[in-house]
Curated annotation (Swiss-Prot):
ATP binds at G296, D297, V298, G299, S300, G301, K302, T303. The gene is recG. It is an enzyme of class 5 (isomerase). It holds the Pfam family Helicase_C. The wedge domain within the N-terminus inserts into the replication fork junction, where the lagging and leading strand split. This is ATP-dependent DNA helicase RecG. SUPFAM superfamilies: Nucleic acid-binding proteins, P-loop containing nucleoside triphosphate hydrolases.
Length: 693
């Protein structure tokens, strides 16, 4: 039997898999036979040979065999079962911190035992804590594994052994079917077929290089990694090509509003802003929708670039919509654009969840009739009740975490008659080039790689929680003596907004007791949008000295007089998020400071993370380091959105393969488009989105 897509085979065809096991496997992304076979081991253990006890090395995993010499219970806070074993070359202690009477009775002196585990140094001899073990009865032969033992990532209720048995069944099914080799030989630079690679990686022979497997460089791994990266790249290219089949309003190059706008600015745009604006203007003249991502570090002036793009659309008699992720940021944009555009005779509308009743109906009517040439808001802009008059450009701020499917949905919502709007996506979270080339291959990318002159560098220091009193004194000095404002950011590792809000309230209360003369405000995710807005407005107008906040202030808030930021539990946040938070200060001409307060002792990864922030303020350098430390899923926020969740590939580890993948993808989509479609269907979950655009 020949099967093109193994995901057509349900898990329930395997023995022992019912609804309960299916649900548990679903938690780790295993929904069908293909998912199970693509759920490759995260590491391997060599249980194919016995190591003499004399030859054991600390921190290595090994299989040993010997006779029990002693079996004793050590009493203390909790009892420990200590079993000494000898094989004639030396002795070792097996230690069990959880044991029962049955284990104690079976491990009596004279019993022959085979055990596997991690070797540790002990006080008197080598030790293995909680080994896997087996009693060898009488003169029964010693049976060893024939292949390396795979270790899988798993979930509660699914043990390693259970997953191995299920994989054995899946491999047996694989033996009896023919999988279509979709990839033609001339497009496959690796010697393994798909079937051979899967079989090899689940059960590698003992003579394979463990080092190659750990590094992901074995040809069997490379075969699967290559095909998966190729499928993703093809999917993005299909979206890009598909976009060019749609119609958009080609905007003619107009300079009237642009020149009047630039003439009223108290500064000159940077060379980078000019370059990126030209790239956008070029795109907007095309008769198909622009899909462009503008990356710029915190404070690089992306809003100005967005304004110039908006003016070109408005000069052509069209409407513009700007969508921001939060009401705070959306209202800030509305205020800025009104200030900039009022003298040009352009009306800027505002639409968010809190605009209700008559005011909302009035705003909707203005949008429908075209009286409002630019409308700013949250995702409320794309609700069914909103009807645009002549929408030509959608600007999406800080939504780089959208996956391609969300970008396509947004495009559909903005469609009018047969025309789709141009899309400009802006982010202040620089995306590492490796990720941009893969995850955002459907977008053209512009980078604003220059900060406006006059920005003051931020001094960043890491201070232990034990010096909290000194930090509070520094806040007091900044607010009282220097007449500056400060942020105090609370972070919780628990994602519960309730707990985070409670922590922020407790800290604000403490600070009010210690600094009663300061005006201290509080903002957190549990507050109503209107409350948050009022507090932020008061902070902006210098009616609040110290703002205690959760990470809701990560994005876009602009208060030039704030020059000190304290981040509690800084070790709990990723580099890019810390960099975003730090970017809330240093927006004026005064020297600014960021204090990363941590709870000791710091782990190695946390030390590395805080050191990077002390060393650099370059968001692109920081994003690359973040990718190295945390991996692509975390950097993109894809734990929530499902962007770039690869089954086999690891973008950091496999980044050198990406240029080769791009070369083959470009050829394949032109020379054999039907093969490209089948590859996408095999590897990508949102099949219908990618293959039918």
């Amino acid at each position: 039997m020949t099967i093109q897509f193994l995901d057509a085979v349900p898990l329930t065809t395997l023995s022992g898999v019912g609804a309960a096991i299916s649900d548990k496997l679903g938690r780790i992304g295993i929904h069908n036979l293909q998912d199970l076979l693509f759920h490759l081991p995260i590491r391997y253990e060599d249980r194919t040979r016995i190591t003499p006890i004399h030859d054991l090395r600390p921190d290595a995993y090994a299989t040993i065999e010997g006779l029990v010499q002693t079996c004793e219970v050590q009493f203390g806070k909790r009892p420990i079962l200590n079993v000494s074993l000898s094989d004639g070359t030396s002795k070792i202690m097996l230690r069990f911190f959880n044991f029962n009477a049955g284990m104690k009775n079976s491990l009596q002196p004279g019993a022959r035992v085979k055990a596997f585990g991690e070797v540790k140094r002990g006080r008197f001899m080598a030790e293995i804590h909680h080994p896997e073990y087996q009693i060898i009865r009488d003169n029964a032969p010693l049976i060893l594994e024939e292949t390396l033992t795979p270790i899988y990532s798993t979930t509660e209720g699914i043990k390693q052994n259970s997953l191995r048995k299920l994989t054995d069944q899946a491999l047996a099914v694989l033996e009896n079917i023919q999988i279509a080799e979709i990839l033609p030989n001339e497009f496959n630079p690796h010697p393994f077929s798909l079937k051979e690679a899967i079989r090899f990686l689940h059960r590698p022979p003992p003579d394979v290089s463990l080092e190659a497997l750990e590094k992901g460089t074995h040809p069997a791994q490379q075969r699967l990694i290559f095909e998966e990266l190729l499928a993703h790249n093809l999917a993005m290219q299909k979206v890009r090509i598909g976009t060019q089949q749609f119609s958009a309003y080609p905007l003619s190059y107009q300079t009237d509003l642009k020149q009047r706008f630039l003439a009223q600015l108290p500064f000159t745009p940077t060379d980078a802003q000019v370059r990126v604006t030209q790239e956008i203007e070029q795109d907007l003249t095309h008769p198909f929708p622009m899909m462009r991502l503008v990356q710029g570090d915190v404070g690089s002036g992306k809003t100005l670039v967005a304004a110039l793009a908006a003016l070109l659309a408005i000069d052509n008699g069209k409407q513009v919509a700007l969508m921001a992720p939060t009401e705070i940021l959306a209202e800030q944009h509305a205020t800025n654009f009104r200030r900039w555009f009022e003298s040009l005779g352009i009306e800027v509308g505002w639409l968010a969840g809190k605009v209700k009743g008559k005011a909302r109906q009035t705003e909707l009517e203005k949008i429908r009739t075209g009286q409002v040439q630019m409308v700013v808001g949250t995702h409320a802009l794309f609700q069914d009740e909103v009807e645009f008059s002549d929408l030509a450009l959608v600007i999406v701020d800080e939504q780089h975490r959208f996956g391609v499917h969300q970008r396509l949905m947004l495009r559909e919502k903005g469609k009018q008659a047969d025309h789709y709007p141009h899309q400009l996506i802006m982010t202040a979270t620089p995306i590492p080039r490796t990720l941009a080339m893969t995850v955002y291959a459907d977008l053209d990318t512009s980078i604003i790689d220059e900060l406006p002159p006059g920005r003051t560098p931020i001094t960043t220091v890491a201070i232990s929680e034990e010096r909290r009193a000194e930090v509070i004194a520094r806040v007091n000095h900044a607010c009282v003596n220097e007449k500056r404002q400060a942020y105090w950011v609370c972070t919780l590792i628990d994602e519960s907004e309730v707990l985070e809000a409670q922590a922020a309230e407790a800290i604000a209360e403490d600070l009010r007791k210690i600094l009663p003369h300061l005006r201290i405000g509080l903002v957190h995710g549990r507050m109503k949008p209107a409350e948050k807005q009022d507090i932020m407005q008061a902070f902006k107008q210098a009616e609040i000295d110290l703002l205690v906040a959760t990470t809701v202030i990560e994005v876009g808030v602009d208060v030039p007089n704030a020059s000190l930021m304290i981040i509690e539990n800084a070790e709990r946040l990723g580099l890019s998020q810390l960099h975003q938070l730090r970017g809330r200060v240093g927006r004026g001409t005064t020297a600014s400071f960021c204090v990363l307060m941590y709870k000791p002792p710091l782990g190695k990864i946390s030390q590395k993370r805080l050191q990077v922030l002390r060393d650099t303020q370059d968001g692109f350098v920081i994003s690359e380091k973040d990718l190295e430390i945390r991996g692509p899923g975390e950097v993109l926020g894809t734990k929530q959105t499902g962007v770039a969740e690869f089954k086999v590939a690891n973008l950091m580890r496999d980044r050198k393969m990406i240029p080769t993948v791009q070369y083959y993808a470009r050829r394949l989509i032109v020379e054999q488009p039907e093969v490209a479609t089948k590859l996408i269907q095999r590897w990508i979950n949102q099949r219908e989105i990618y293959t039918h655009v």
